[in-house]
Amino acid sequence: MIDPTLLRNNLSEIAEKLKVRRGFILDVDKFSQLEEQRKTLQIKTETLQAERNSRSKTIGAAKARGEDISTLLAEVDHMGAELNTVKEELANVLTEIEQLALTIPNIPADEVPLGKDDSDNKEVFRWGTPKKFDFEVKDHVALGEILGGLDFAAGVKLSGARFAVIKGQIARMHRALAQFMLDLHTEQHGYTEAYVPYLVNHTTLYGTGQLPKFGEELFHIKPLENEQTYALIPTAEVPVTNLVRDEIIDEADLPIKMTAHTPCFRSEAGSYGRDTRGLIRMHQFDKVELVQIVEPEKSMEALEELTNQAEKVLQLLNLPYRKVLLCTGDMGFGATKTYDLEVWIPAQNTYREISSCSNMWDFQARRMQARCRAKGDKKTRLVHTLNGSGLAVGRTLVAILENYQNADGSITVPEVLRPYMNGIEIIGK
């Protein structure tokens, strides 16, 4: 959530900056109208409180003199009733302002390129050279069928479209990938591993910005009567980041760096007809998430570090990729700056997103009231939060199957994964 004070004091400037966000126009007139109502009611509340306090003192003095105070008491009671009414009106206006503020995306950083969609993203660099095959390249679906390791028909039978059953050595590689990523991030990159709930409450989803705007993209769990309403997590970013909600952190304890391997659940609303074949776009997929909680002045530096750590996974797996700086029209709702990592997919002859690494600035921290304080300082300030995929396990599996395929349909196991697969070098029939 954007700082309300910043909105009040720089409304026109903020509205102009947010015009570059795809599909969003800040309703300046509505916000201004609500803000005027807030000011009027705030002044009225303060005036009534002052008058009531003054009359209360008058009552005390009159009573001490033995005077009749019944009229004064009636006036104070009337003021009290009027004050309660005005307070209620003020609370309603403040709620409206907050609800409007919750729909406003984050302000893009100055260095983010202007653009309408992903065609305007800026490529930063490419790493690795796509392999030239001397045979007809198969996609991961065909390879999975040859090896008996990807069963989409079973996924449809058990659940429906955009589900799959992974079996045998391919399932083992899927597990190995997650273990490899976690070991890399905990042993070399300084992250603490977390095991978190896959079901979260709505307060948690508000904290990281999924609600109220993106409710249709979530799988909601209908509770029994009088029970808490839950949603399945769309990413481990949600529970892991919310661990610092309502906390005041000693700045000496920052940065906090946490990683988690979880399944992720997304309805893929708005994705009808896109990537209907294979593992690229599923309702359920695994991901290793990276989260950092940092001091405000260090968040841009932390974004570079976090992105480099996600890149390291691709480099160790020797998978060609490119790094892309997202434009204003393609960034996520809560991000101020985002890098996407896109891995080479031979059968599609293109790069596909495998990681998105974002600096959320104080956007989530304000929603969560996550603060930090320097030693000896009474004042607190909002932390900055960052997150990124390190990596999406299913898409990494797709990239390995296609980039490491052999002419007979077998798959060469990347060297860094072999210790996790009991030394297996080739996955064959």
From Swiss-Prot:
Subcellular location: Cytoplasm
Listed EC numbers: 6.1.1.11
Entry superkingdom: Bacteria
Keyword Protein biosynthesis attached: yes
GO cellular component terms, semicolon-separated: cytoplasm
InterPro entries, per database record: aa-tRNA-synt_IIb, aa-tRNA-synth_II, aa-tRNA-synth_II/BPL/LPL, Ser-tRNA-ligase_type_1, Ser-tRNA-synth_1_N, SerRS_1_N_sf, SerRS_core, tRNA-bd_arm
Disulfide bridge positions per record: none
Single Gene Ontology MF annotation: serine-tRNA ligase activity
Binding site for ATP: R266, S267, E268, E353, I354, S355, S356
Reactions catalysed, as given in the entry: tRNA(Ser) + L-serine + ATP = L-seryl-tRNA(Ser) + AMP + diphosphate + H(+); tRNA(Sec) + L-serine + ATP = L-seryl-tRNA(Sec) + AMP + diphosphate + H(+)
Gene3D superfamilies, sorted: Bira Bifunctional Protein, Domain 2, Serine-tRNA synthetase, tRNA binding domain
Positions contributing to L-serine binding: T235, A236, E237, E289, S389
Keyword Lipoprotein: no
Annotated keywords: Aminoacyl-tRNA synthetase, ATP-binding, Cytoplasm, Ligase, Nucleotide-binding, Protein biosynthesis
GO biological process, one term: selenocysteine biosynthetic process
Pathway info: Aminoacyl-tRNA biosynthesis; selenocysteinyl-tRNA(Sec) biosynthesis; L-seryl-tRNA(Sec) from L-serine and tRNA(Sec): step 1/1
Role description: Catalyzes the attachment of serine to tRNA(Ser). Is also able to aminoacylate tRNA(Sec) with serine, to form the misacylated tRNA L-seryl-tRNA(Sec), which will be further converted into selenocysteinyl-tRNA(Sec).
Free-text note on domains in this protein's UniProt record: Consists of two distinct domains, a catalytic core and a N-terminal extension that is involved in tRNA binding.
Family: Belongs to the class-II aminoacyl-tRNA synthetase family. Type-1 seryl-tRNA synthetase subfamily.
Subunit structure: Homodimer. The tRNA molecule binds across the dimer.
UniProt-recorded name of the protein: Serine--tRNA ligase
